[in-house]
């Protein structure tokens, strides 16, 4: 399997990247965290599978937790690239970083989330920046189908209030723009027991990450152009 990888910032707290440990969200101040990180991979760039439709997953450590499962479930049907980071959409560098990946390949589907690193950001400001992101995606990738993935609930019901607020604001942005598919990961995860399925305040254990991967993969395959089947690879 061929791949290219761009590591923009090494994270000493690596567990925050892989989705199993603490995440420095609590250090968020003015939309910026004490430790910012960004990781990306693009698979099958030169091998015999390079001409399959390409999908871009954009998110944070939650996305990093399910991206491997998505790649396995969609293997042979599409190529999956992903960019995961700690950056809030309100950061000036966010659009510049996103633009780099949008210019890298032609994508059939772009599955997008931003939110858990924005829980201390003013919601109207975040929603405005999110709208700018979707406009950039459409400008750079006019043929791509866009999926908005809702941010997932936190272990704390009290702290999840802000997540729901951001999701509601995002829903309004999506409705106003039109033509964007919604993948409601919040509703998928919300019924599960927090003590049993959450590994910390933000992240999920493997069995729950697999459920996320299955829903993401199903959503992607259902809108993938010329997809021979929406069935997941077993």
Per-region residue spans from a language model:
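Bacterial N-terminal signal peptides that target proteins for export
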Residues: 1-6
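Bacterial N-terminal signal peptides
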Residues: 8-15
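Boundary at the C-terminal end of the N-terminal hydrophobic targeting segment
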Residues: 15-21
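Conserved SGNH/GDSL esterase-like catalytic core that processes O-acyl groups on lipids
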Residues: 23-132, 155-157, 161-164, 203
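Conserved beta-strand segments of alpha/beta enzyme cores
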Residues: 79-81, 145, 179-181
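Glycine-rich phosphate-binding loop signature in dinucleotide/nucleotide-binding domains
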Residues: 103-105, 140-141, 223
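Active-site segments of SGNH/GDSL-like serine hydrolases
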Residues: 111-117, 134-168, 189-192
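Catalytic His-Asp segment of secreted/periplasmic serine-dependent ester chemistry enzymes
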Residues: 153-234
């Amino acid at each position: 399997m061929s791949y290219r990888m761009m590591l923009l910032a090494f994270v000493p707290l690596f567990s925050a990247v892989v989705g199993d440990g603490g995440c420095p969200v609590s250090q968020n101040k003015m939309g910026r965290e004490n430790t910012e990180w960004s990781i990306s991979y693009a698979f099958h760039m030169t091998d015999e599978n390079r001409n399959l439709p390409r999908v871009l997953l954009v998110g944070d450590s939650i996305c990093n937790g399910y991206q491997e499962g998505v790649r396995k479930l969609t293997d042979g049907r599409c190529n999956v690239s992903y960019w995961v980071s700690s950056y809030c959409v309100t950061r000036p560098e966010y659009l510049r970083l996103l633009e780099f990946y949008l210019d890298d390949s032609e994508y059939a589907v772009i599955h997008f989330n931003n939110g858990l690193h924005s829980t201390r950001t003013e919601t109207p400001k975040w929603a405005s920046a999110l709208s700018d992101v979707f406009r950039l995606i459409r400008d750079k990738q006019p043929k791509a189908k866009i999926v908005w993935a809702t941010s997932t609930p936190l272990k704390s019901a009290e702290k999840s209030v802000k997540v729901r607020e951001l999701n509601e604001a995002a829903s309004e942005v999506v409705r106003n723009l039109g033509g964007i598919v919604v993948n409601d990961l919040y509703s998928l995860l919300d019924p599960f027991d927090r003590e049993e399925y959450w590994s910390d305040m933000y992240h999920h254990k493997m069995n729950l990450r697999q459920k996320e991967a299955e829903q993401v993969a199903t959503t992607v395959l259902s809108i993938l152009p010329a997809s021979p089947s929406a069935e997941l690879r077993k």
